[in-house]
Amino acid sequence: MPADVKAAQSSAGDSRPGERDKALDLVLGQIERNFGKGSIMRLGDASRMRVETISTGALTLDLALGGGYPKGRVVEVYGPESSGKTTLTLHAIAEVQKRGGVAAFVDAEHALDPVYAASLGVDIENLLVSQPDTGEMALEIVDQLVRSAAVDIVVVDSVAALTPRAEIEGEMGDLAVGAQARLMSQAMRKITGNIGKSGCTVIFLNQLRLKIGVTYGNPETTTGGNALKFYASVRLDIRRIQTLKRGTEEYGIRAKVKVAKNKVAPPFRIAEFDILFGRGISTLGCVLDLAEETGVVTRKGAWYSYEGDNIGQGRDNTIGWLEQNPEAKDAIEVLVRQKLTEGSEVTANSMRPLAAAARSAAAKPSAKTADTDKKLVADGAA
């Protein structure tokens, strides 16, 4: 080995940690002077370790997301028509406004119902609303709102309605292949960095389309190309799985949300909750579901019981009891949150199987099973 190489390796090995630290501090200071404070930082800084969240309005979905929508990130919510996408985001807006935050709604579909939004708890007097003419206008408005650092949440409804200017100015039937995908790709490159710096959460609602000629696998895809899929930190797939009825009257739907992507918590979790027509997400229903799964409320047959007392026959009657007894409801919710904080087995990976297991465990055992259990207890005592 040449002597100069040996000398270089020796000098590199003999360099003192103090000198390396000085060199690192020097280059970090130079980078911050050139590009601004915060352009480079240590990942372990206390201000960067924990990602703050915004509540979704559904306790079960908050659990599945690891706390709620992450601040300073892009979120995509997609699903078929009438599945609860807009309702979900209006609840997020209401939660932000309750805490004194500022919310904006970019209504590209021109379909926002102020009366319905107000019924969900949205302060429509202070809600910023834009109904843009083109997709470029909508995304430029989003970018300016984000860069202001004065807005906490921006909702875009929806990506499918972000029509490029060239398509609007052209004639009906003209082909504009890939125009919307190029628009979204350029916008996401520009907006994402500003979103992280400002701490604003931007939620894009999206529609489903079917791929042509797909024989195997899922033929469903979202509009606007692939850029949003990559830039989104959280992607939620919401589906309508049941229609809630009282007799022949329909009063709501049962929604199921799958966390298709999550960069800030474990993905692929599933949450279910009720959406009541004209009232939005049933918070009492979420509390009852988690109370049953954590064992705070037990169910035998059709009866729900709390602290040994029957509180309602059937789910609807039990929810009515919780509504009439707010103190008991608050106590149950506190116990549920304590169990979840202590690391309960409920992880929201699949809410329905856990509930089924709890019901089967609470069911009355057969005589043969009871005899077996007695034998096992006797053997354990021996």
UniProtKB/Swiss-Prot annotation:
Give the binding site residues for ATP.
G79, P80, E81, S82, S83, G84, K85, T86
**Region of interest (Disordered), ranges:** 1-20, 360-382
For this chain, the family text in UniProt reads:
Belongs to the RecA family.
Keyword annotations: ATP-binding, Cytoplasm, DNA damage, DNA recombination, DNA repair, DNA-binding, Nucleotide-binding, SOS response
Which Pfam family is an annotated match for this chain, by its short name?
A: RecA
**One biological process term in Gene Ontology:** DNA repair
Q: Which organism is it from?
A: Synechococcus sp. (strain CC9311)
According to UniProt, the name of this protein is Protein RecA
Checking PROSITE patterns in the record gives: RECA_1 (PS00321), RECA_2 (PS50162), RECA_3 (PS50163)
Which segments show compositional bias classed as Low complexity? 360-369
Spell out the InterPro entries in the cross-references.
AAA+_ATPase, DNA_recomb/repair_RecA, DNA_recomb/repair_RecA_CS, P-loop_NTPase, RecA-like_C, RecA-like_N, RecA_ATP-bd, RecA_C_sf
Report the gene name: recA
One CC-aspect GO term = cytosol
Gene3D superfamilies to which the protein is assigned, alphabetical: P-loop containing nucleotide triphosphate hydrolases
Q: What does this protein do?
A: Can catalyze the hydrolysis of ATP in the presence of single-stranded DNA, the ATP-dependent uptake of single-stranded DNA by duplex DNA, and the ATP-dependent hybridization of homologous single-stranded DNAs. It interacts with LexA causing its activation and leading to its autocatalytic cleavage.
Disulfide bonds, paired cysteine numbers: none
